[in-house]
Amino acid sequence: PDTTTHTGTEDCEIAVVRYLQKFASSRPAPLLRGYVQLATTVVPGKHVALDNANLNPTVAAAPIRLNGAQVYGVDTPHYLGPTIVATKDRPTRVLFRNLLPTGMAGDLFLPVDTTMMGAGEGPNAMMLDPITKVPMDMATNDGTVLDQVRNPVCGQDPKPASCYSENRAIVHLHGGITPWISDGNPHQWTTPAGDSSDYPKGVSMQNVPDMPDPGPGAQTFFYTNQQSARLLFYHDHAWGITRLNVYAGEAAPYLITDDTEKKLVAPGGALDGVDMGNSGLGHSLTIEDKTFVPDAAKVAHNDPTWNYAKWGGQGNLWTPHVYMPAQNPGAATGNSPFGRWMYGPWFWPPSTDQKYKPIANPYYDPTCDANVQPFCEPAQIPSTPNVSVGMEAFHDTPIVNGTAYPKTTVDPKAYRFRILNAADDRFWNLSWFVADPTTGTMTEVALKKSEVTAAQSDPVVQPTVDQTLSPKGPDWVQIGTDSGFLPTPAVVPAQDVTYITDPTRFDFGNADKHALL
């Protein structure tokens, strides 16, 4: 960091850019958005010329220029970077620049539900009811899959300037004690300099008063660091697209250290002799889950509405974008094996006050016999838009520090890990078990074969560890959380997750036993 520009604080310049990076050596590199530290005269680093990559990897990346000059980074943009290391009570100042492309070129490469607040029409696109003064719904509702309710105007290409753009970005320090002007809340985003959107910045965006105004497409932040040692993280928080920006890569660790921690790791301290890694701060593990676009044949079978041109082909990030109800009135059982959500009009008792009722299904076949055919389309379908947001997603590929299914070699000694759960909505039950000696790779834990077989056809079954082949390994010793050090260490042995199955209990279905969860 820069310790000379402002007395008593540490300064750094950070930008958001687009880049390509592989999560596995055998897979294509998906397009990502992420943070990179900018090179300055005080902190030049490796002085890497920055550019914005494209969804089509055959198209050359566009050099990033600011006021006509090439922009340089301290390092090459990489996933979950840069980590900011701060000291308790020594503030950090951040100059943030949104260096994403302008206009359509800067659109997200993920499905955006523009009916979400902050992702679609802005105030300039709205008309007030002359009597109630409430914004009117301008979409034409013809009750078909092609009308404006199902295909919002802000989801079209190009979208009107009165719609919120998809290249908005911000920095929010999650868990920090921060003045409101530097919170990075959903209404403090900025667009890149020169963008044609009607809304170049959020309505509550403010710069730090004693720092120079960085101009359009940039803003300044002041973090107090008035907290004990802990692992936090900073991430995007732009209104309406936070979940997508973070999924695309806009997140990174933020470490605060203090004198107490220094005493613990010093010679003779409680953590003396524990492996702290090359940084001396512990081994950071950021655990996520993602899904990647498969080959064209699988996409055609499983997700025929996926837009290759807009969201990317094989190897790029995939996320749910179709509202799939768990009910199917056209099926003999009334259920849909593909569904995820309960649709109100098909629930019991059915909801009747929704603004947009179910609409005619263009794929309905009245001759389909649900008692004979494996699947029949219902006469009606939900009136949800194309694209529809998913309330949550449980992705199929675990990612640790930007690598899918990673492995590492350790010595028989104690290590300090700093673990951040950055999954979309998934909890991780972390345990140590001895590797299955029958696999040959020594990287897999043995699971009970009968449960593995049952799980192939029953998603309710969750295979547990076969401890005859993979006995329990060492315990975890938990010493802290994102609220600082614990008053006393907690020993956490290996344990499969079990669930409360007594339907008479109020917490029926909750996790019962677990390890480090």
Where are these regions (language model features)?
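Histidine-centered copper-binding motifs that mark active-site loops
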Residues: 1-517
